[in-house]
Amino acid sequence: MASQYYVGIDVGRRQHSLAVLAADRPSTWTQIAVFPFSADAPGFIAALHYLAQAGAAPGVTRCALEATGGYYSRPIYAALRAHGYAVQWIKNPAVHDLRETVYGRRSKTDAEDARLIARLLYLQEAVGQEYAFHLVQSGDERYQYLRLLVDLRWKQVQARRRASNQLTQVLDVLFPEFRLIFRKSVTGPTALHLLRRFPTVDAIADASVEDLHQVLVGEAKSLRHQTAAPQLKQWAQETAGLQGGTGPLQLAQEWLVQTLTDLDRSVADLDQRLAAAVQPLPEAGVLATFPAMSPTRVATLLAGMGAPVTQFPTDRTLRKQWGWYVEVEQSGARYRSRLGRGGNRGTRRELYLLAMQLVQDRAADNPFRHYYRRLVQGNPTPKVPKVALGHVASKLTSVMFVCMRRGTPYDPQQLWRHMGITVSA
């Protein structure tokens, strides 16, 4: 009878490490050889040849690898699956916890991690539930593509925020009165268009009022600034900004203006791609019926799922995936609970912002705001606002899960009745 084999693979950018553990020799796991191979076609061929030499045929072998390094693990995952091997992605904390247990605070090495992953597979089968670990959803290509777009958009938005802050600082030195004209933002579309047409304070001061008005209203379409041209020209002529030695700052301003323009176009392009990617997903139409829900927010939530809602058996599993779950620590009389650190950070952020938006006084009346107030004013034990907001986000996730599983739009009246709240007409 062929022995069972467990293969652990530590993934790197250009080189992977592979360890093969035989079920009939489990005690040797700390000494088993580790085979390094390059992350390309010759390396994959060498790895498959190594598995064959070790006797690890597809029918008697389980493979696992960490879902780390962005997309670096996908090629080897696909190659092993194509050759008939059973492959799993495991979450990083499983390997981290076993490493801490076995090695303590020793330095991490690729060889040790490959052996640990193989050991985890063996313990899961030999011991059972005590060594169960969380698997990563292999996902759906549509949702994976959506996650890529959402991640790219987030990076572009962060880059724009940094460039915006830098341009604001430069303008505070060169033309501090600029913010008196553009009170909302000195890096908005109208302000950037003006700075592209008139890149220096002197250029604004020398321009005619008619030219400034044409740029602000005729070209930038900013009706808010219909009467701003005369004041803008006057401030440019009387500015308290730096007058001499402004060459480096002027160069920085021109570069930042162009950078912000390019980033705005990039974000707009990504928004169009997100709208097209979200449209065919069945859950998108359901989420869009919830209050305070924007297209970007819908895309972020679906990207955080990574798979159709049918892959989640309960709302608790969806909360875990979205990063909105509670971790409890209890020892004797000591009890501590906190929001878990796992899950998708983007969806956790969106859930928090959505819950905060729904409970505000200026928001339209909705069941979630009543739920929040009931928790804050609770009897006999009121909850602090921060904790109550967490409960609102959790309730919101549960309602979203039920609606998506049923394929029905959000119905506030039904939720009012379910929560036992009577709404006056």
Regions found by a protein language model. Give the residues of each.
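A detector of single, family-specific signature residues
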Residues: M1-A425
